[in-house]
Amino acid sequence: LYSYVEHDCIIGDYVTFAPGVKCNGNIHIEDHVYIGTGAVIKQGTPEKPLVIGKGAIVGMGAVVTKSVAAGTTVVGNPARILEKK
């Protein structure tokens, strides 16, 4: 039950990774983000990294294919907005 973080990722302060998270390359995760068990964050590009905004929540098993705005909760495959603060 491990999580992994690939190349060129930037992770902010107070970020929580539950078990089994897969964080692929060129991703920027801002402060106070929670990423649920088994979530997959697809790879960004060096020119346009995938961004998980401040205070966002990624639900268990979600597959994130595009950036998530700050304060947003996303769930599902592919990840869709459940709630926006």
Residue ranges of each PLM-predicted region?
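Structural signal for interior beta-strand "rungs" in well-ordered beta-sheet cores
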Residues: 1-75, 80-82
